[in-house]
Amino acid sequence: MAQILAPSIQCQTRITKTSPLATPISSKMWSSLVMKQNKKVARSAKFRVMAINSGTINRVEDLLNLDITPFTDSIIAEYIWIGGTGIDVRSKSRTISKPVEHPSELPKWNYDGSSTGQAPGEDSEVILYPQAIFKDPFRGGNNILVICDAYTPQGEPIPTNKRHKAAEIFSNPKVEAEIPWYGIEQEYTLLQTDVKWPLGWPVGGYPGPQGPYYCAAGADKSFGRDISDAHYKACLYAGINISGTNGEVMPGQWEYQVGPSVGIEAGDHIWASRYILERITEQAGVVLTLDPKPIEGDWNGAGCHTNYSTKSMREDGGFEVIKKAILNLSLRHKVHIEAYGEGNERRLTGKHETASINTFSWGVANRGCSIRVGRDTEKNGKGYLEDRRPASNMDPYVVTALLAESTLLWEPTLEAEALAAQKIALKV
């Protein structure tokens, strides 16, 4: 992100009642996605034309786009949680008797954890606690998406529930006083369904070298714009604090930015945005991957750069606070790397706008460093830092909480601090 501005004033865990005229993302948008993708989608389009002749698709689409708001007080709540891999999103729907404005108004629910790799078959019940709600861009009306975290029946967070610990860190008085802001740059790659090869690439072959694809326009340079744009609009509709999107360096790869968000909201909004993206690619007949290095060779990987600032960093003299934070991050480099995403060693090679995974570095305007500081921050003497190490498949609850913990709660010894400052050429 070019800069971190003030967070939106909208309450990120509340939702207002929508107008009865509110509608979900139109069927025309989904149709355009379906008609423009890979061979499988072409076959689907052929079936679609045949089905339209019999009226089947028209009747189904009428029901899919039906706004139930004028006809019932009940709403549909889509409960969303993180599955057993720590990166997959799962969901199921239930009827709620009336519109809600806050997750505390929603009931807890349960699911079969043995089917998601999160519980044994003989004791498979996992409990969902609603934590944040968003408007549903697929169903429209007063219907909602519900971000949940997962617990045992005894109330203990299950191992894949990283939100629980993050919430504890963000509720620490020292952290709350600093009002941590996050701007997260989520990169992702679109794959052709049948062959698991990037969208726009010749099957079994490669496009021309990187260079013409970043932020490009044109049928020979930009692949998947409809999906990116549909996702952008769906996130805005949902109330996600999405701030931008762009085509990436590798063809078939895209990025969107979420933030600035305060504390735990950053993780909630990233997970909600990922779920929406999964649903859109599902309807478009395209596969979404968050693999940090989907294609080996001279191609950029996919990251999740995390921009971070505290109240002290944003005030006059904040650059000195930023440098102290960088010092702490250098001393905990291995801790962060271990928590920054699976397969990240394939991406952090020191090439393709990355630093080496084994070496901590920082610099002003240097995209080959672990931590980048912008020119404006250096010039103004205050601002934010960008952690370029997180992989595209990182857990935002883990990354955001760890940044706060390392820079606001963890204190190194003076000796370790002095040695680290000398090692990374940092005057504090």
UniProtKB/Swiss-Prot annotation:
- PROSITE patterns registered for this protein in UniProt: GLNA_1 (PS00180), GLNA_ATP (PS00181), GS_BETA_GRASP (PS51986), GS_CATALYTIC (PS51987)
Transit peptide residues?
1-49
Top-rank taxon of the source lineage equals Eukaryota
Any one annotated GO CC term: chloroplast
Q: Which residues belong to any copy of the GS catalytic domain?
A: 159-428
Primary localisation category: plastid
Spell out the note in the miscellaneous section.
Answer: Irreversibly inhibited by the herbicide L-phosphinothricin (PPT).
Q: Which family does it belong to?
A: Belongs to the glutamine synthetase family.
Question: What is the protein name stated in its UniProt record?
Answer: Glutamine synthetase leaf isozyme, chloroplastic
The species is Medicago sativa
